């Protein structure tokens, strides 16, 4: 008989969250005592908006670089299939507030100063779908998200600065 599992993100009531926000999903502890933290980086309101793939793809590539420039320990930042945000996996303990500030700073850079030459992994050799990028869309979404502010609480708006 298959093992019964609960996938936390499918237990979250997506109708009561208030995006954009950063939410600590879990802290996992390894056998040697090491800690991995998993965050829900929700950029748009579930079931009301979705970032089209080209813009999301470009944001993904930029966050892979920009987050690592701002904090050590990033393992991965992968988009949700629903296209409303990302899972951010980190080594060590981190707060939602600190991660929200890092995401805000990264989106500010995307919105204001990133050029096409700054986007990593946009060649046929470095990306599995290199034609599906849009810096224009990434900048537009970054501006829209920043206008709302990123909260460190998924249920009550508490925008970090």
Swiss-Prot record:
Q: Name one GO biological process term.
A: quorum sensing
| Enzyme Commission numbers on file | 4.4.1.21
A GO molecular-function annotation: iron ion binding
Q: What class of enzyme is it?
A: lyase
The question of whether Metal-binding is a record keyword is answered with: yes
* Recorded catalytic activity of this chain's protein: S-(5-deoxy-D-ribos-5-yl)-L-homocysteine = (S)-4,5-dihydroxypentane-2,3-dione + L-homocysteine
* Residues involved in Fe cation binding: 57, 61, 127
Q: Which InterPro entries match?
A: LuxS_sf, Metalloenz_LuxS/M16, S-ribosylhomocysteinase
Has the keyword Isomerase been applied to this entry? no
Q: What cofactor requirement does the entry state?
A: Fe cation
* UniProt keywords, alphabetically: Autoinducer synthesis, Iron, Lyase, Metal-binding, Quorum sensing
What does the entry's cofactor note say about binding and number?
Answer: Binds 1 Fe cation per subunit.
Family statement drawn from the similarity comment of this UniProt entry: Belongs to the LuxS family.
Q: Which NCBIfam families match?
A: PRK02260.2-5, PRK02260.3-1
Function, as annotated, reads:
Involved in the synthesis of autoinducer 2 (AI-2) which is secreted by bacteria and is used to communicate both the cell density and the metabolic potential of the environment. The regulation of gene expression in response to changes in cell density is called quorum sensing. Catalyzes the transformation of S-ribosylhomocysteine (RHC) to homocysteine (HC) and 4,5-dihydroxy-2,3-pentadione (DPD).
Describe the subunit structure: Homodimer.
Entry protein name: S-ribosylhomocysteine lyase
